[in-house]
A protein has these predicted regions:
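Aromatic-residue-lined binding/catalytic grooves and analogous aromatic/hydrophobic interfacial grooves
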Residues: 1-408, 424-428, 446-449, 506, ...
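Short, glycine/acidic-rich hinge or "gate" loops at secondary-structure transitions
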Residues: 320-329, 437-440, 457-467, 517-524, ...
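Acidic/His metal-coordination segments adjacent to aromatic residues that form catalytic metal sites
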Residues: 328-339, 393-412, 469-493, 629-641
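Alpha-helix capping and helix-loop boundary segments enriched in small/acidic/polar residues
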Residues: 338-342, 355, 404-415, 431-443, ...
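Well-ordered alpha-helical segments within folded domains of soluble proteins
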Residues: 345-356, 414-425, 496-506, 561-570, ...
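Core alpha/beta catalytic barrel or barrel-like domain that forms the active/cofactor pocket
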Residues: 384-386, 413-426, 462, 467-470
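Non-catalytic carbohydrate-binding regions of carbohydrate-active enzymes
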Residues: 425-431, 436, 448-458, 521-553, ...
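Acidic/histidine-rich catalytic neighborhood
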Residues: 447-511
Length: 751
């Protein structure tokens, strides 16, 4: 099967281009029919104008009054006061000048190759997901683009006869000062942003023709080697780091990139999804997507969507030192939407939802490095803003890790750090790496628990409440004001925050018991769990999103925060908590009936929720809708108004995995939400908690065969009466338990 996105016309807009990357460097080939344009990015290129900011110590004095107002049901006044003193300018120290904002992620420019004559004859472009090579061909010249994950460079390989202008170009940006650089064998640019970040783009030229610094001729073959460096330590130091990475280029292009392709396959071949093939591969990808939008079917396109998301996870993380932001590592705008920031209330988390199941747990590590890097500032923020030990994350952040609450309303939320505790613990569950649990996951989780030990307050019934609290970015009618916009409603103990506290305390108790540490903390956390405000169900049978029945300001809101316990949390289940599970289904159905899921990432969340609800056809419809309405012609996820935002790509493929294997809690369910349209197929290499690996084949909508390679834990608990060969098998409570040494292959005979 051909694994290529391909087209017979140029990408007229950036969002329809072809993405390449290795985590540190990134590029987008979009051309627009007027020559070659490679949009360049470096993961650390920010202006630093807003890098040095502190939380406002005056905010804390208002916390008792905010709590009094909210506990008395005066949500509007409590929210107004909190917004004034905590969110935006109110939450940032008065000594800091300028508006409250996140530092924007900046493009490194556009590398242009403009042929002297352009006719666009025999135009063809493609992205090969099997080799990572993006190819553009027209007028007898072929351009091949690769982001090398071994040499950590970008390559442009040119074959054919060419005469062209080359250089680095920039959009207008008042924060940027730059100069072109040229010599007899290279070109590029040096720049500095007014915040003090310097950067350099360096392109080395190897050609069998000629090059004079701005004009390139090629007789048969040329190679451009691109590297980018950034820093706040001066242009000389930036250039020196580029110098240190320069190496001779003596191999043929195919030999040069061979180690990269080998490394790529060593990671990507861990998981392979196969679906029934359809005769659509000879049709350009944009035309196939349009047919899909018009109601056609194309399972091969669905597989392409899955493989592309898998490719993006590799391309955005493998050489990275920082996690992927809202646009991953790809941005062409000096002032990108939402500054290409890190959103801690769904978006950054969603970027890593599929990582563990896909066998790419190493992709998670840059996220953990980043989160651990925030801890010093997070401790200061917790103490300064809320008078608490432990850690507090603002709702948005950037690479400077400040934890300052920059957004009025949205940032008066204390759940961000707790959400990431689930990622730490999940990585342990899948890897069974006890050293990771001891040295990284548990210390982080304990900091979160410590914060809530101090933050929770007792009401007059002796119940522990989370105040102030919010359901991220959502609002209710009682907290609306005709005179001013109130973007988010604060409350007492939202369902989202209850779920986060419940989860982190429960998992921290498990972790402490596994490690045999902190015996004195376990009863403290258990006492909190026993006294914590429980999740509630309204008179209409829906899960209460806030602490009482409140009319929603936007019934079809894009966030599904109150359903966290179903996904990604997984502790609300049909078997264990049936009443809450049914209430979540009713809440979810009501939200969608009012137009919910109107962004790409929101649809991705819906796909996972539907899969957890066991509704495969509905989950599949969510993914199809993501392709139809929320994807560009090159399958980039789109957020209204049709701008690239990468989280949906990962939410979508996580949803596909959830249709095939459900592994929340201790039980594993095979094909829990298989859609009718996916009658036949197979998946090889889905990772399981405990370190195991599962492969499945299904025929006519039923499990046909499979195998499980046992992990470090030595056991897998399967939901249902599953017929197995190998290991020690026992049946109890409607489940099948298999135990065997690590590496043992268990054959699945059927259900």
């Amino acid at each position: 099967m051909m694994k290529k996105l391909w087209y017979n016309s140029p990408a007229l807009e950036w969002k329809h281009g072809l993405l390449i990357g290795n985590g540190r460097l990134a590029g987008n080939i979009f051309g627009n029919g007027h020559g070659e344009r490679l949009g360049l990015n470096h993961e650390l290129l920010y202006s630093a104008k807003y890098a040095d900011r502190e939380c406002n110590p005056e905010s804390l004095q208002y916390l008792p009054e905010i709590r009094r107002l909210l506990m008395n049901g005066n949500y509007l006044e409590g929210t107004k006061l909190a917004n004034k003193v905590y969110g935006g300018a109110g939450g940032v120290a008065k000594a800091v000048k300028g508006p409250a904002r996140i530092d924007p992620y900046k493009p490194a420019g556009e590398l242009v190759i403009i042929p002297d004559v352009i006719e666009n004859r025999d135009y063809y472009r493609s992205l090969d997901l099997d080799t990572t090579i993006a190819t553009v061909h027209y007028d007898g010249v072929t351009y091949e683009y690769v982001a090398d994950s071994v040499a950590d460079k970008l390559y442009i390989h040119i074959t054919g006869k060419l005469s062209a202008r080359v250089g680095i170009e920039y959009m207008e940006d008042k924060q940027l000062h730059y100069l072109p650089t040229v010599s007899d064998d290279r070109f590029g640019a040096k720049g500095e942003y007014e915040g003090g970040v310097q950067f350099e783009v360096r392109v080395r030229v190897f050609t069998d023709g000629s090059f004079d610094g701005t004009h390139l001729t090629v007789e048969k073959e040329a190679l451009l080697v691109v590297d980018i460096e950034t820093g706040r330590d001066g242009a000389v130091a930036v250039s020196a780091r580029l110098d240190s990475r320069e190496t001779p280029v003596e191999e043929r292009f195919c030999d040069l990139i061979a180690p990269h392709i080998e490394k790529y396959h060593s990671v990507m071949d861990r998981l392979v999804l196969d679906l029934e093939e359809e005769e659509t591969e000879d049709i350009p990808t944009d035309q196939r997507i349009q047919t899909y939008r018009n109601g056609g079917t194309d399972l091969t396109l669905l597989k392409m969507y899955f493989d592309f998301g898998h490719y993006l996870l590799y391309s955005g993380t493998i050489c990275a030192t920082m996690p992927m932001n809202l646009q991953g590592k790809w941005n062409n705008l000096p002032a990108p939407p939402w500054s290409s920031d890190y959103h801690h209330n769904i978006n950054l988390q969603m970027n890593y939802w599929p990582a563990e199941m896909m066998g790419m747990g190493e992709a998670h590590l840059t996220l953990f490095n980043y989160l651990e890097g925030i801890i010093p500032q997070a401790k200061k923020a917790a103490k300064t803003l809320y008078g608490c030990r432990g850690i507090y994350f603002s709702q948005t952040d950037d690479i400077w890790m400040r934890c300052t609450p920059e957004s009025t309303g949205w940032d008066v939320w204390v759940g961000g750090a707790a959400w990431y505790a689930e990622h730490f613990f999940r990585h342990y569950e899948y890897t069974q790496d006890e050293a990771f649990l001891r040295d990284r996951a548990y210390p982080y989780m304990k900091e979160v628990c410590t914060f809530f030990e101090d933050y929770l307050i007792e009401d007059d019934r002796g119940v522990l409440q989370i105040v102030p609290s919010q359901s991220p970015e959502n609002y209710f009618v009682r907290c609306m004001d005709e005179k001013e916009e109130i973007p988010v409603s604060l409350c007492v103990s939202s369902a989202m925050d209850i779920s986060l506290v419940q989860e982190v305390m429960t998992n921290s108790i498990k972790a402490a018991q596994i490690l045999g540490v902190d015996a004195d903390r376990i009863p403290v956390w258990q006492s909190i769990l026993d006294r914590l405000q429980p999740l509630g169900i309204g008179s209409d049978g829906r899960l209460l999103e806030w602490n009482e029945e409140l009319e929603e300001g936007e019934p079809g809101h894009r966030h599904m925060s109150h359903l966290y316990g179903v996904y990604p949390g997984g502790f609300i289940t049909a078997e264990g908590t049936p009443e809450l599970f049914d209430a979540c289904i009713k809440s979810y159905d009501a939200r969608l009936s009012h137009g919910g899921g109107y962004t790409g990432w929101s649809r991705g969340w819906c796909a996972n929720l539907d899969a957890r609800f066991g509704r495969g056809d509905s989950a599949f419809e969510q993914v199809k809708e993501m392709i139809r309405e929320f994807s560009s012609d090159s399958l980039m996820d789109l957020h209204p108004p049709k701008i690239f935002q990468i989280d949906g790509n990962f939410g979508g493929i996580a949803g596909i995995l959830e249709m095939l294997v459900r592994a929340n809690g201790e039980k594993v369910k095979l094909l829990p939400a298989l859609p009718k349209e996916l009658k036949n197929g197979s998946v090889r290499g889905i990772r399981l908690p405990g370190g195991g690996v599962c492969s499945l084949t299904w025929r006519d909508g039923k499990l046909y065969s499979g195998e499980i390679t046992m992990g470090i834990s030595g056991k897998v608990l399967l939901d249902g009466d599953v017929q197995l060969s190998g290991g020690t098998v026992s049946k109890h409570d409607g489940c099948t338990l298999v135990t065997a040494p690590v590496g043992t292959v268990i054959t699945i005979l059927g259900v």
